[in-house]
């Protein structure tokens, strides 16, 4: 975050790990991770939600390092990818919510 009373803009960014190899302590194989992705996608979760669950619950920091593909590519190969891109879906959802709010709270 930037400073209010200084010209600096701050350095808030996420840093990728230096090593792009699978950690030695990770016991899941590529097929195990793919099965988890399929199972979570069938529940209706988005690719970013799947990544958060894999990171927090299963210890998979980067799916791409373990499987060789990103989550969305894995879902597309199985035919489980969402029909709208995730960012576009959330923009549409927000626009609908703003319209609904403006209809209710007209001056």
UniProtKB/Swiss-Prot annotation:
Assembly, per entry: Component of the small ribosomal subunit. Part of the small subunit (SSU) processome, composed of more than 70 proteins and the RNA chaperone small nucleolar RNA (snoRNA) U3.
PTM sites of type Phosphoserine: 30
Subcellular location, record wording: Cytoplasm; Nucleus, Nucleolus
Cellular component, GO, one term: nucleolus
Location of N6-succinyllysine modifications: 27, 34
Name of this protein: Small ribosomal subunit protein uS15
Residues recorded with modification Phosphotyrosine: 38
Residue list for modification N6-acetyllysine: 27
InterPro entries per UniProt: Ribosomal_uS15_arc_euk (IPR023029), Ribosomal_uS15_N (IPR012606), uS15_NS1_RNA-bd_sf (IPR009068)
PTM section of the record: Ubiquitinated at Lys-27 by RNF14 and RNF25 in response to ribosome collisions (ribosome stalling).
Cross-link Glycyl lysine isopeptide (Lys-Gly) (interchain with G-Cter in ubiquitin): where in chain: 27
Location of cross-link Glycyl lysine isopeptide (Lys-Gly) (interchain with G-Cter in SUMO2): 43
Biological function: Component of the small ribosomal subunit. The ribosome is a large ribonucleoprotein complex responsible for the synthesis of proteins in the cell. Part of the small subunit (SSU) processome, first precursor of the small eukaryotic ribosomal subunit. During the assembly of the SSU processome in the nucleolus, many ribosome biogenesis factors, an RNA chaperone and ribosomal proteins associate with the nascent pre-rRNA and work in concert to generate RNA folding, modifications, rearrangements and cleavage as well as targeted degradation of pre-ribosomal RNA by the RNA exosome.
GO-annotated biological processes: ribosomal small subunit biogenesis; translation
Main location, first listed in the record: cytoplasm
Cross-referenced Gene3D superfamilies: 4.10.860.130, S15/NS1, RNA-binding
Pfam families in alphabetical order: Ribosomal_S13_N (PF08069)
Keyword line: Acetylation, Cytoplasm, Isopeptide bond, Nucleus, Phosphoprotein, Ribonucleoprotein, Ribosomal protein, Ubl conjugation
GO molecular function, one term: small ribosomal subunit rRNA binding
Family: Belongs to the universal ribosomal protein uS15 family.
